[in-house]
């Protein structure tokens, strides 16, 4: 069951892009960038559409929140693939953390892999690096 967005978001009319002020910036962790490079071209095209038309417009409305070790992260499903991301609403940023296939019970499962990266501290480091690039220096 999909959760409704916490704050109302104006969704552009069909074929219309959100204005720069309304759209979320999409940022990628190094691991997510590597995940995307490893995808087949047609899957990358599908992913690009998901990112531009859905997650950049209304990431809460098109995603589902995760629980457990990945609480505060969201997922969007397309085919057998998942995009795992974190939303920073005050910054209007969606940080893409991982892209991969759901293989329940398999060590290659996207959720198991991301939990492992999170437990190691590498995910926090990568997110901090992504945010550091967009935050003004103080």
Across the structure, where does each feature detected by a protein language model lie?
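A generic beta-sheet turn/junction motif
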Residues: 78-80, 89
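A short, surface-exposed loop/turn module that caps and links secondary-structure elements
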Residues: 52-77
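N-terminal "first-domain core" detector
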Residues: 2-39, 43
């Amino acid at each position: 069951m999909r959760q409704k967005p916490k704050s109302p978001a104006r969704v552009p009319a069909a074929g219309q892009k959100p204005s720069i002020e309304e759209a979320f910036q999409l940022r990628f962790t190094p691991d997510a960038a590597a995940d995307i490079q490893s995808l087949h071209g047609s899957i990358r095209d599908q992913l690009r559409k998901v990112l531009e038309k859905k997650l950049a417009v209304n990431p809460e409305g098109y995603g589902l929140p995760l629980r457990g070790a990945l609480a505060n992260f969201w997922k969007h499903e397309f085919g057998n693939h998942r995009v795992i991301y974190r939303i920073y609403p005050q910054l209007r940023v969606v940080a893409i953390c991982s892209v991969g296939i759901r293989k329940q019970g398999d060590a290659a499962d996207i959720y198991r892999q991301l939990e492992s990266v999170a437990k190691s501290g590498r995910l926090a480091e990568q997110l901090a690096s992504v945010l550091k690039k967009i935050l003004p220096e103080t």
